[in-house]
C-alpha cells in the first residue's frame, strides 16, 4: 500500500502532480508552475505542498528532460486547436501571451503553422451569416465586427470581399 501523501517528500508529490497535470493535456511552463504552486484539494480541504523553489525547478527540469513539457509543442497544438474552433491569429497570439509564451516563439509558430487565415475568416463569416455574404455597408460592418472579435486581422477580413468581387 502506498504511504500517505503527507509523509512523501515534497519533490515526489510535486512530480506526481506534474505528471498528472501533463497527462491530461499539454501546458506551457508558466501554466504548469502556476498549477503546481496552487493548493491541492485533500480529504480535509485545501492542502499546501511544503516545497522549496529548488523542488519546483527540479520538477520542471525533469518534465523537460523526459519530454512531458515542451513549449514549442504546446504552442503548435494550441494554435491548431484554437484555429479549429474558429479563432483568428490576433486572439491566439493574445491567449498565448497570457499563458506565458514569448512573442518570438509565438511568431515563429504562427509562420510555421500554414493556416490560411483569410479562408478561415471567410468560413466563419459564412457559418454565421450564410452564403452569399452581405454586400451592403451596414451588414458588412456587422461581419467585420464579428470577425475582429474572433481575432482575425483586418487584412484577412478585407480579403474576403476582394476575393468575393473577383
UniProtKB/Swiss-Prot annotation:
Top-level taxonomy: Bacteria, Pseudomonadati, Pseudomonadota, Gammaproteobacteria, Enterobacterales
Species assigned in the record: Salmonella typhimurium (strain LT2 / SGSC1412 / ATCC 700720)
A Pfam family of this chain: RecX_HTH2
Subcellular location: Cytoplasm
Family recorded in the similarity comment: Belongs to the RecX family.
Protein known as: Regulatory protein RecX
Any one annotated GO CC term: cytoplasm
Biological role: Modulates RecA activity.
Gene3D superfamilies, A to Z: Winged helix-like DNA-binding domain superfamily/Winged helix DNA-binding domain
Amino acid at each position: 500500500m502506498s504511504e500517505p501523501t503527507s509523509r512523501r517528500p515534497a519533490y515526489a508529490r510535486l512530480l506526481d502532480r506534474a505528471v498528472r497535470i501533463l497527462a491530461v493535456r499539454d501546458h506551457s511552463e508558466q501554466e504548469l508552475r502556476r498549477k503546481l504552486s496552487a493548493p491541492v484539494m485533500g480529504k480535509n480541504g485545501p492542502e499546501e505542498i511544503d516545497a522549496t523553489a529548488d523542488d519546483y525547478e527540479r520538477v520542471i527540469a525533469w518534465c523537460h528532460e523526459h519530454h512531458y513539457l515542451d513549449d514549442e509543442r504546446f504552442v503548435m497544438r494550441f494554435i491548431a486547436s484554437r484555429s479549429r474552433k474558429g479563432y483568428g491569429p490576433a486572439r491566439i497570439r493574445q491567449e498565448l501571451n497570457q499563458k506565458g509564451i514569448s512573442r518570438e516563439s509565438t511568431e515563429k509558430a504562427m509562420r510555421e503553422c500554414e493556416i490560411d487565415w483569410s479562408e478561415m475568416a471567410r468560413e466563419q463569416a459564412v457559418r454565421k451569416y450564410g452564403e452569399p455574404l452581405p454586400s451592403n455597408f451596414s451588414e458588412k460592418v456587422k461581419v467585420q465586427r464579428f470577425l475582429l472579435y474572433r481575432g482575425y486581422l483586418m487584412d484577412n477580413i478585407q480579403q474576403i470581399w476582394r476575393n468575393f468581387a473577383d
